[in-house]
Amino acid sequence: MNYLLTYALYILILSVLMGISTWKLFKKLGYSPLVAFVPFYNYFIVLKETKHPKWWVVLAYFPIVGTIMMTIFHLFLMKKFGRDSIGQKLLTIVLPFIYMAVVNYSSDVRVIKDYDEDDRKETVLGSLTYAVVFATLVHTFSFQPFGIPTGSMERTLLVGDFLFVNKLSYGYRMPMRPLALPFLQGTIWDTGEKGNPKDDPKSYVEAVKLPYWRLPGWDNVQRNDIVVFNYPDDSVHVSIDRKDSYVKRAVAVAGDVLEIKGGKLFINGKPEEVMGDAEMQQSYDVAASSPLDIPSLYKYLGFLPVVERGQNTKGEYIYYFSGLTSQLVEEIKQIPEVISVTPKIQEKGVKDVAHYLNLEASKREGIYVESKKINYSSSIFPFNKDWNKDWYGPLRIPKKGDVITLTQENLPEYRTLITKYEGNILEYKGGAVYINGEKTDKYTVKQDYYFMMGDNRDASLDSRYFGFVPETHIVGKPMFTWMSVEGLFSNDQSHYQANGKKLRFDRMFKATNTGNADKASYWWLAVILLTLFFGWEYFVKFFKKKKEED
């Protein structure tokens, strides 16, 4: 069932519930009881009778924000019939159609006098509601705030950067779980290490679901774009749009052939094009004749995740830096105590395999002990290849329309694509492949895919581990950094942390996806948004008063 038809069905159900629970109230207002059953028009009458802006009705059935607006409209209607106490408001919010039905079928219900101007004067609650609705509209339908808690894109994007993500440029993806709390991605809160993440309270209603549908955009994901997408291996959330959001660089797009040789990335047989704003990082071992003053190093070079390895047999002090740019490497080499700076490159032919933690053994031994169970989400993709993060491929990125010849050898590469991403049933039995019960050795790809990698190449969980990112999972393009706070998130891969919290003003309201080293400033946009946010009601009242005076 397509998106619009499914959504129309939900609107019809809500309209029937509205009609059943309020038709007598509409009759008391002087309208036909049938009006209560008519989508949009029923709420239009509520706004008209309660003397509120009638254009608000267009928001009644919007995904996410519609829940807020309908609740507000229900409160208006109940107030019109004298149900305005705190308890009655709570019942209207929590049990809307049940409580309104109780009022509807009560014998003593009557219409109260029209609102006085004093009754509708601005309150803290009213201002808060306006702010929530405005922010929800922006967050849901155009620019979504996104914070960076990890260092996979260092130093192109920094831990503590907060971005505005343009959800329109690649085509707006309509919400797939329209009944949800605003501003929350997947869960309301984390129940902790002992709890199963799948049992955490969700911020959305899973039962109310809509199919995938993307509106046309004005751009496609280009090679080297920085992209926000939903993490494909998120097993906690079924809905695509509720999976965790990741930000990486699209190093390869549909149809490209990717290969990594000795830590160097090649696309279609050529060395990758490094964008002007990209600061690629790799991991290094640094040997020093005496202990390094890491806190002082931070003052000159900024925060660098580092782990002390102790002394080697030569008496040298070894430090593991999980991410250094080529420029930082040269600066560290100039430190008098530094003896050598050696890149950490994995051996060719050694497969990257991750195992789950053996919790009981780790507690008993007091150290990290791996179990025998393989963590496929953090192991190399595809699992049947002897690849690792530094020696990878060649791998072709699937493109819409590609006809794949399926073999036992390449099934691990395409199984998730065929089943999870494109909704088919795949079986391998008797030496043959069956898709949806039919024997075949061919499959036609239904959508484009992308290969995402972090600029901090050795500290990034990316497509080398979770595989292709389908078009359905694309959220949008980061537009600019609206705030940046150093030290906001701790780095569990470092023995040292940033010294306190401080704003990085030089990064605020700067473009994040231009490909140029010199970032454009968006302070002008910040001024416009703040003026709209805080000044909307003021301007509305000002022009309304002027109109009345004229």
Regions found by a protein language model. Give the residues of each.
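Extended hydrophobic leader/signal-anchor segments used for secretion and membrane insertion
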Residues: D114-D550
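Feature marks short, highly hydrophobic, charge-poor N-terminal signal-anchor/signal peptide-like helices
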Residues: M1-L9
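Membrane-cytosol interface at the C-terminal ends of transmembrane alpha helices
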Residues: L12-I112, S142
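Short, flexible segments with low predicted structural confidence
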Residues: L9-Y10, L17-M18, L125-T129
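N-terminal low-hydrophobic presequence detector
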Residues: N2, M18, L59-A60, A252, ...
